[in-house]
Amino acid sequence: MKKRVVISGLGFITSIGNNTPDVLASLREARSGIEIFPELPQEPGYPRVAGTVKGFSFPSTTFDDWTWPPEYTIERTQLRSMCPHVVYAFCAMQQAIAQARLGPERVSHPRTGAMCASGGSMWMIYEHLHVMVTRGVHKCYPLALPAAIPGTLNSNLAADFKLKGAVLGFASACASSAHAFGYGYDQISQDRQDVSFIVGAEDCNLHSILPFTGVRALSLVADPGKTPAPFDAKRDGFVGTGGAAVVVLESLDSAQARGADIIAEVLGWGEAADGYNVMAPEPEGEGLARAMSSALAAAGVTPDEVDYINAHATGTVAGDLSEIKAIRRVFNGTRVPQVSSTKALTGHGLCLAGAMEAAFTALALKNRFMPISAKISQLDPACVGVPVLTKPVGEEPVVAISNSSGFGGANVSLVLKRWE
Protein backbone atom coordinates (compact mmCIF):
# COMPACT_ATOMS: atom_id res chain seq x y z
CA MET A 1 0.00 0.00 0.00
CA LYS A 2 1.27 3.47 -0.89
CA LYS A 3 2.19 5.69 2.00
CA ARG A 4 0.50 9.07 2.28
CA VAL A 5 2.83 12.03 1.78
CA VAL A 6 2.58 15.45 3.41
CA ILE A 7 4.47 18.73 3.46
CA SER A 8 5.89 19.48 6.90
CA GLY A 9 8.24 22.39 6.22
CA LEU A 10 9.03 25.20 3.79
CA GLY A 11 11.98 27.50 3.21
CA PHE A 12 12.18 30.55 0.96
CA ILE A 13 14.79 32.88 -0.44
CA THR A 14 12.79 34.60 -3.18
CA SER A 15 12.11 37.92 -4.79
CA ILE A 16 8.88 38.25 -2.77
CA GLY A 17 10.32 37.30 0.60
CA ASN A 18 13.06 35.46 2.44
CA ASN A 19 10.82 33.65 4.91
CA THR A 20 7.36 32.12 5.04
CA PRO A 21 5.50 35.07 6.66
CA ASP A 22 6.83 37.56 4.10
CA VAL A 23 6.10 35.25 1.17
CA LEU A 24 2.59 34.61 2.46
CA ALA A 25 1.93 38.35 2.80
CA SER A 26 3.24 38.99 -0.72
CA LEU A 27 0.99 36.30 -2.19
CA ARG A 28 -2.06 37.61 -0.32
CA GLU A 29 -1.41 41.24 -1.24
CA ALA A 30 -0.09 40.63 -4.78
CA ARG A 31 3.16 42.33 -3.77
CA SER A 32 5.65 42.10 -6.63
CA GLY A 33 9.36 41.45 -6.21
CA ILE A 34 10.27 42.81 -9.66
CA GLU A 35 12.71 45.75 -9.74
CA ILE A 36 15.04 47.55 -12.11
CA PHE A 37 18.14 45.34 -12.16
CA PRO A 38 21.34 47.39 -12.66
CA GLU A 39 23.35 44.35 -13.80
CA LEU A 40 21.29 44.26 -17.00
CA PRO A 41 21.97 46.74 -19.84
CA GLN A 42 19.69 49.70 -19.13
CA GLU A 43 19.02 50.53 -22.76
CA PRO A 44 16.36 49.80 -25.39
CA GLY A 45 16.31 46.29 -26.81
CA TYR A 46 17.41 44.66 -23.56
CA PRO A 47 15.56 43.44 -20.47
CA ARG A 48 15.97 45.90 -17.61
CA VAL A 49 14.09 44.30 -14.72
CA ALA A 50 14.36 41.13 -12.66
CA GLY A 51 12.87 39.45 -9.63
CA THR A 52 15.69 40.54 -7.35
CA VAL A 53 16.81 38.62 -4.27
CA LYS A 54 17.19 41.03 -1.37
CA GLY A 55 19.70 40.82 1.48
CA PHE A 56 22.45 38.99 -0.43
CA SER A 57 25.45 40.35 -2.34
CA PHE A 58 27.87 38.55 -4.66
CA PRO A 59 30.11 41.27 -6.16
CA SER A 60 32.79 38.82 -7.31
CA THR A 61 33.52 35.10 -7.46
CA THR A 62 35.73 35.51 -4.38
CA PHE A 63 33.62 34.16 -1.53
CA ASP A 64 35.26 36.52 0.99
CA ASP A 65 33.35 39.31 -0.78
CA TRP A 66 29.94 37.68 -0.35
CA THR A 67 27.34 38.81 2.19
CA TRP A 68 24.06 37.30 3.35
CA PRO A 69 21.53 37.97 6.15
CA PRO A 70 23.15 37.83 9.60
CA GLU A 71 20.78 35.18 10.97
CA TYR A 72 22.58 32.54 8.90
CA THR A 73 26.03 31.17 9.66
CA ILE A 74 28.00 29.76 6.73
CA GLU A 75 31.54 28.58 7.41
CA ARG A 76 34.42 29.42 5.07
CA THR A 77 35.00 25.71 4.53
CA GLN A 78 31.42 25.46 3.26
CA LEU A 79 31.56 28.59 1.11
CA ARG A 80 34.60 27.36 -0.81
CA SER A 81 32.54 25.06 -3.03
CA MET A 82 29.41 27.21 -3.27
CA CYS A 83 27.96 29.55 -5.86
CA PRO A 84 25.19 32.11 -5.22
CA HIS A 85 22.24 29.76 -5.61
CA VAL A 86 23.78 27.25 -3.22
CA VAL A 87 24.06 30.03 -0.63
CA TYR A 88 20.37 30.77 -1.16
CA ALA A 89 19.50 27.09 -0.81
CA PHE A 90 21.65 26.66 2.31
CA CYS A 91 19.65 29.42 4.00
CA ALA A 92 16.29 28.10 2.77
CA MET A 93 17.20 24.61 4.01
CA GLN A 94 17.80 25.97 7.50
CA GLN A 95 14.35 27.57 7.45
CA ALA A 96 12.65 24.39 6.25
CA ILE A 97 14.40 22.20 8.81
CA ALA A 98 13.42 24.59 11.61
CA GLN A 99 9.80 24.84 10.46
CA ALA A 100 9.51 21.06 10.18
CA ARG A 101 11.20 20.71 13.59
CA LEU A 102 13.61 18.10 12.28
CA GLY A 103 16.47 17.31 14.64
CA PRO A 104 20.02 16.53 13.47
CA GLU A 105 19.44 12.79 13.90
CA ARG A 106 16.45 12.94 11.54
CA VAL A 107 18.20 15.13 8.95
CA SER A 108 21.33 12.98 8.84
CA HIS A 109 19.57 9.64 8.50
CA PRO A 110 19.67 6.89 5.85
CA ARG A 111 15.94 7.44 5.18
CA THR A 112 16.26 11.20 4.67
CA GLY A 113 17.35 12.49 1.27
CA ALA A 114 17.08 15.41 -1.13
CA MET A 115 15.87 15.89 -4.68
CA CYS A 116 17.50 19.00 -6.12
CA ALA A 117 17.37 21.10 -9.27
CA SER A 118 19.43 24.00 -10.58
CA GLY A 119 20.99 25.03 -13.86
CA GLY A 120 24.42 25.43 -12.33
CA SER A 121 26.13 28.81 -12.18
CA MET A 122 26.75 30.32 -15.61
CA TRP A 123 28.50 33.20 -13.86
CA MET A 124 31.00 30.96 -12.06
CA ILE A 125 31.56 28.90 -15.21
CA TYR A 126 32.24 32.02 -17.28
CA GLU A 127 34.57 33.63 -14.76
CA HIS A 128 36.64 30.52 -14.12
CA LEU A 129 36.85 29.58 -17.80
CA HIS A 130 38.09 33.10 -18.46
CA VAL A 131 40.91 32.52 -15.96
CA MET A 132 41.75 29.17 -17.56
CA VAL A 133 41.85 30.62 -21.09
CA THR A 134 43.77 33.80 -20.23
CA ARG A 135 46.08 32.61 -17.45
CA GLY A 136 46.19 28.83 -17.74
CA VAL A 137 44.50 25.96 -15.98
CA HIS A 138 46.96 25.96 -13.07
CA LYS A 139 45.76 29.44 -12.10
CA CYS A 140 42.18 28.23 -11.72
CA TYR A 141 40.55 27.97 -8.33
CA PRO A 142 40.71 24.27 -7.36
CA LEU A 143 37.04 24.08 -6.34
CA ALA A 144 35.74 26.06 -9.32
CA LEU A 145 34.30 22.96 -10.97
CA PRO A 146 32.21 21.62 -8.06
CA ALA A 147 31.08 25.19 -7.31
CA ALA A 148 29.73 25.81 -10.81
CA ILE A 149 28.24 22.64 -12.32
CA PRO A 150 24.51 21.79 -11.98
CA GLY A 151 25.39 19.13 -9.40
CA THR A 152 26.83 21.76 -7.09
CA LEU A 153 23.45 22.09 -5.38
CA ASN A 154 22.93 18.47 -4.37
CA SER A 155 26.60 17.82 -3.60
CA ASN A 156 26.97 20.84 -1.32
CA LEU A 157 23.70 20.25 0.53
CA ALA A 158 24.48 16.56 1.02
CA ALA A 159 27.88 17.42 2.50
CA ASP A 160 26.80 20.40 4.60
CA PHE A 161 23.69 18.80 6.10
CA LYS A 162 25.20 15.30 6.31
CA LEU A 163 22.42 13.78 4.22
CA LYS A 164 22.66 9.99 4.00
CA GLY A 165 19.58 9.00 2.01
CA ALA A 166 18.80 9.34 -1.69
CA VAL A 167 20.27 12.61 -3.01
CA LEU A 168 19.72 13.36 -6.71
CA GLY A 169 19.91 16.24 -9.16
CA PHE A 170 17.40 16.83 -11.96
CA ALA A 171 17.82 18.57 -15.31
CA SER A 172 14.62 19.14 -17.30
CA ALA A 173 14.93 22.90 -17.72
CA CYS A 174 12.07 24.82 -16.11
CA ALA A 175 10.33 21.61 -15.04
CA SER A 176 13.39 20.41 -13.11
CA SER A 177 12.37 21.04 -9.51
CA ALA A 178 8.81 19.90 -10.25
CA HIS A 179 10.32 16.61 -11.44
CA ALA A 180 12.41 16.60 -8.24
CA PHE A 181 9.19 17.04 -6.26
CA GLY A 182 7.46 14.19 -8.07
CA TYR A 183 10.30 11.75 -7.64
CA GLY A 184 10.71 12.79 -4.01
CA TYR A 185 7.03 11.97 -3.55
CA ASP A 186 7.62 8.55 -5.12
CA GLN A 187 10.53 7.83 -2.77
CA ILE A 188 8.26 8.35 0.23
CA SER A 189 5.00 6.89 -1.10
CA GLN A 190 6.89 3.71 -2.05
CA ASP A 191 8.43 3.55 1.45
CA ARG A 192 12.00 4.02 0.28
CA GLN A 193 12.51 7.21 2.33
CA ASP A 194 10.71 8.89 5.23
CA VAL A 195 11.77 12.47 4.45
CA SER A 196 12.89 14.15 1.25
CA PHE A 197 13.99 17.76 0.86
CA ILE A 198 12.81 19.14 -2.47
CA VAL A 199 15.16 21.95 -3.47
CA GLY A 200 15.01 24.31 -6.43
CA ALA A 201 17.55 27.12 -6.78
CA GLU A 202 19.05 29.49 -9.34
CA ASP A 203 21.54 32.36 -9.39
CA CYS A 204 20.11 35.83 -9.88
CA ASN A 205 22.59 37.71 -12.05
CA LEU A 206 23.26 38.88 -15.58
CA HIS A 207 24.66 35.52 -16.65
CA SER A 208 21.58 33.57 -15.56
CA ILE A 209 19.08 35.98 -17.14
CA LEU A 210 20.47 37.85 -20.15
CA PRO A 211 21.09 34.81 -22.44
CA PHE A 212 17.33 34.37 -22.82
CA THR A 213 17.28 37.66 -24.71
CA GLY A 214 18.88 35.79 -27.59
CA VAL A 215 15.81 33.58 -27.99
CA ARG A 216 13.43 36.55 -27.69
CA ALA A 217 11.90 35.11 -24.52
CA LEU A 218 12.42 38.02 -22.11
CA SER A 219 10.14 40.97 -21.53
CA LEU A 220 11.58 44.30 -22.68
CA VAL A 221 9.10 46.35 -20.65
CA ALA A 222 11.08 48.64 -18.35
CA ASP A 223 8.30 49.27 -15.81
CA PRO A 224 8.46 46.67 -12.98
CA GLY A 225 4.80 47.34 -12.22
CA LYS A 226 3.70 46.15 -15.65
CA THR A 227 5.80 43.06 -16.31
CA PRO A 228 5.75 40.11 -16.40
CA ALA A 229 2.06 39.90 -17.22
CA PRO A 230 1.01 36.28 -17.82
CA PHE A 231 -2.33 36.00 -19.66
CA ASP A 232 -2.39 39.73 -20.48
CA ALA A 233 -3.21 40.61 -24.08
CA LYS A 234 0.00 42.65 -24.40
CA ARG A 235 2.43 40.35 -22.59
CA ASP A 236 5.86 40.30 -24.21
CA GLY A 237 7.89 37.67 -22.37
CA PHE A 238 9.11 36.54 -18.99
CA VAL A 239 11.23 38.27 -16.35
CA GLY A 240 14.12 36.37 -14.80
CA THR A 241 14.60 35.70 -11.12
CA GLY A 242 16.68 33.55 -8.79
CA GLY A 243 16.68 32.35 -5.21
CA ALA A 244 15.81 29.05 -3.58
CA ALA A 245 12.80 27.15 -2.28
CA VAL A 246 12.83 24.06 -0.10
CA VAL A 247 9.84 21.80 0.52
CA VAL A 248 10.02 19.09 3.17
CA LEU A 249 8.12 16.02 2.00
CA GLU A 250 7.48 13.44 4.69
CA SER A 251 5.43 10.32 5.16
CA LEU A 252 2.24 10.99 7.08
CA ASP A 253 3.24 8.31 9.59
CA SER A 254 6.55 10.02 10.30
CA ALA A 255 5.06 13.52 10.50
CA GLN A 256 2.27 12.49 12.86
CA ALA A 257 4.64 10.47 15.05
CA ARG A 258 6.75 13.61 15.50
CA GLY A 259 3.74 15.88 16.05
CA ALA A 260 4.68 17.96 13.00
CA ASP A 261 2.55 20.88 11.83
CA ILE A 262 1.32 19.58 8.47
CA ILE A 263 1.01 22.24 5.76
CA ALA A 264 -0.65 20.25 2.97
CA GLU A 265 -0.99 16.74 1.59
CA VAL A 266 0.48 15.64 -1.73
CA LEU A 267 -2.01 13.40 -3.53
CA GLY A 268 -0.01 12.52 -6.64
CA TRP A 269 1.70 13.80 -9.73
CA GLY A 270 2.02 13.28 -13.47
CA GLU A 271 4.54 13.93 -16.21
CA ALA A 272 4.52 13.91 -20.01
CA ALA A 273 6.65 15.15 -22.89
CA ASP A 274 5.43 17.17 -25.86
CA GLY A 275 7.65 15.38 -28.38
CA TYR A 276 7.45 18.53 -30.45
CA ASN A 277 10.33 21.05 -30.30
CA VAL A 278 13.51 21.68 -28.31
CA MET A 279 12.22 25.08 -27.18
CA ALA A 280 8.68 25.93 -28.28
CA PRO A 281 5.71 24.42 -26.45
CA GLU A 282 3.31 22.22 -28.39
CA PRO A 283 0.70 24.79 -29.51
CA GLU A 284 -2.40 22.83 -28.45
CA GLY A 285 -1.12 21.99 -24.97
CA GLU A 286 -1.39 18.27 -25.60
CA GLY A 287 1.61 17.26 -23.47
CA LEU A 288 0.68 19.37 -20.47
CA ALA A 289 -2.89 18.10 -20.72
CA ARG A 290 -1.62 14.52 -20.49
CA ALA A 291 0.54 15.45 -17.49
CA MET A 292 -2.47 16.96 -15.69
CA SER A 293 -4.71 14.00 -16.53
CA SER A 294 -2.05 11.57 -15.35
CA ALA A 295 -1.62 13.52 -12.12
CA LEU A 296 -5.34 13.55 -11.42
CA ALA A 297 -5.59 9.81 -12.07
CA ALA A 298 -2.65 9.11 -9.75
CA ALA A 299 -4.20 11.34 -7.09
CA GLY A 300 -7.64 9.75 -7.36
CA VAL A 301 -9.15 13.16 -8.07
CA THR A 302 -11.73 14.01 -10.74
CA PRO A 303 -11.37 17.24 -12.74
CA ASP A 304 -14.43 18.81 -11.11
CA GLU A 305 -12.81 18.42 -7.67
CA VAL A 306 -9.94 20.79 -8.53
CA ASP A 307 -10.42 24.31 -7.17
CA TYR A 308 -7.24 26.10 -8.24
CA ILE A 309 -4.38 25.83 -10.72
CA ASN A 310 -1.06 27.57 -10.13
CA ALA A 311 -0.16 27.86 -13.80
CA HIS A 312 3.31 27.60 -15.26
CA ALA A 313 2.47 30.66 -17.40
CA THR A 314 5.61 32.77 -17.67
CA GLY A 315 4.29 35.65 -19.76
CA THR A 316 5.31 34.45 -23.22
CA VAL A 317 2.64 34.55 -25.90
CA ALA A 318 3.06 30.93 -27.02
CA GLY A 319 3.55 29.35 -23.61
CA ASP A 320 0.57 30.96 -21.89
CA LEU A 321 -1.76 30.11 -24.76
CA SER A 322 -0.59 26.49 -24.88
CA GLU A 323 -1.35 26.12 -21.17
CA ILE A 324 -4.80 27.65 -21.53
CA LYS A 325 -5.56 25.09 -24.25
CA ALA A 326 -4.26 22.29 -22.02
CA ILE A 327 -6.58 23.40 -19.22
CA ARG A 328 -9.53 23.43 -21.62
CA ARG A 329 -8.67 19.87 -22.74
CA VAL A 330 -8.59 18.48 -19.22
CA PHE A 331 -11.56 20.38 -17.82
CA ASN A 332 -13.79 20.12 -20.88
CA GLY A 333 -17.37 19.68 -19.75
CA THR A 334 -16.58 20.23 -16.06
CA ARG A 335 -16.22 23.18 -13.73
CA VAL A 336 -12.97 24.92 -14.76
CA PRO A 337 -10.78 25.75 -11.73
CA GLN A 338 -9.61 29.25 -10.91
CA VAL A 339 -6.23 29.89 -12.57
CA SER A 340 -3.39 32.28 -11.78
CA SER A 341 0.33 32.65 -12.36
CA THR A 342 2.40 33.73 -9.37
CA LYS A 343 5.26 34.46 -11.78
CA ALA A 344 3.65 37.88 -12.25
CA LEU A 345 4.96 38.59 -8.74
CA THR A 346 8.23 36.66 -8.65
CA GLY A 347 9.46 36.41 -12.20
CA HIS A 348 10.42 33.06 -13.73
CA GLY A 349 12.83 31.05 -11.61
CA LEU A 350 13.77 28.45 -14.26
CA CYS A 351 14.88 25.32 -12.36
CA LEU A 352 13.67 26.96 -9.14
CA ALA A 353 10.12 27.52 -10.40
CA GLY A 354 8.49 24.14 -9.77
CA ALA A 355 9.51 23.82 -6.12
CA MET A 356 8.81 27.49 -5.42
CA GLU A 357 5.33 27.40 -6.91
CA ALA A 358 4.43 24.09 -5.27
CA ALA A 359 5.39 25.73 -1.98
CA PHE A 360 3.23 28.76 -2.84
CA THR A 361 0.33 26.44 -3.62
CA ALA A 362 0.73 24.62 -0.31
CA LEU A 363 0.74 27.94 1.55
CA ALA A 364 -2.38 29.08 -0.28
CA LEU A 365 -4.20 25.85 0.59
CA LYS A 366 -3.23 26.04 4.26
CA ASN A 367 -4.30 29.68 4.47
CA ARG A 368 -7.48 29.19 2.42
CA PHE A 369 -6.98 31.65 -0.41
CA MET A 370 -5.98 31.74 -4.07
CA PRO A 371 -3.24 34.15 -5.22
CA ILE A 372 -4.31 36.39 -8.07
CA SER A 373 -2.66 36.75 -11.47
CA ALA A 374 -1.32 40.29 -11.15
CA LYS A 375 -0.53 42.97 -13.74
CA ILE A 376 -3.34 42.08 -16.14
CA SER A 377 -4.71 45.26 -17.70
CA GLN A 378 -6.57 43.44 -20.48
CA LEU A 379 -7.08 39.69 -20.37
CA ASP A 380 -6.05 37.93 -23.58
CA PRO A 381 -9.29 37.07 -25.44
CA ALA A 382 -7.82 33.61 -26.00
CA CYS A 383 -8.38 32.96 -22.28
CA VAL A 384 -12.16 33.28 -22.55
CA GLY A 385 -13.86 30.45 -20.69
CA VAL A 386 -10.93 29.93 -18.32
CA PRO A 387 -11.39 31.86 -15.04
CA VAL A 388 -8.07 33.69 -14.70
CA LEU A 389 -8.00 35.29 -11.26
CA THR A 390 -7.51 39.04 -11.64
CA LYS A 391 -8.94 39.92 -8.23
CA PRO A 392 -9.38 38.04 -4.96
CA VAL A 393 -12.33 35.71 -4.53
CA GLY A 394 -13.85 34.32 -1.37
CA GLU A 395 -13.63 30.68 -2.41
CA GLU A 396 -11.38 28.56 -0.18
CA PRO A 397 -9.50 25.96 -2.24
CA VAL A 398 -9.27 22.35 -1.11
CA VAL A 399 -7.54 20.68 -4.07
CA ALA A 400 -5.00 22.42 -6.29
CA ILE A 401 -2.67 21.69 -9.19
CA SER A 402 0.76 23.23 -9.69
CA ASN A 403 2.00 23.07 -13.29
CA SER A 404 5.54 23.29 -14.66
CA SER A 405 6.87 23.07 -18.21
CA GLY A 406 10.38 23.26 -19.60
CA PHE A 407 12.40 23.48 -22.80
CA GLY A 408 12.10 20.30 -24.82
CA GLY A 409 8.47 19.87 -23.86
CA ALA A 410 8.91 18.57 -20.31
CA ASN A 411 5.62 18.86 -18.41
CA VAL A 412 4.87 18.13 -14.76
CA SER A 413 1.67 18.51 -12.73
CA LEU A 414 1.52 18.18 -8.96
CA VAL A 415 -1.75 17.65 -7.06
CA LEU A 416 -1.98 19.01 -3.51
CA LYS A 417 -4.79 19.03 -0.96
CA ARG A 418 -5.51 21.22 2.04
CA TRP A 419 -4.77 19.41 5.28
CA GLU A 420 -7.79 19.28 7.58
Placement of each model-derived feature along the sequence:
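ACP-dependent fatty acid/polyketide chain-elongation machinery
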Residues: 1-75, 253-265, 359-373, 417-420
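Condensing-enzyme catalytic core mediating Claisen C-C bond formation in acyl metabolism
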Residues: 4-8, 31-36, 46, 223-299, ...
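Conserved beta-ketoacyl condensing-enzyme motif
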Residues: 7, 28-172, 201-209, 303-319
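Active-site-proximal alpha-helical scaffold in enzymes
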Residues: 89-102, 150-153, 158-161, 166-201, ...
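Glycine-/small-residue-rich "gating" segment that lines the acyl/pantetheine channel
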Residues: 134-141, 182, 186, 190, ...
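Acyl-CoA/ACP chain-elongation machinery
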Residues: 38, 43, 192-236, 269-283, ...
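Conserved small-residue
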Residues: 9, 27, 93, 114, ...
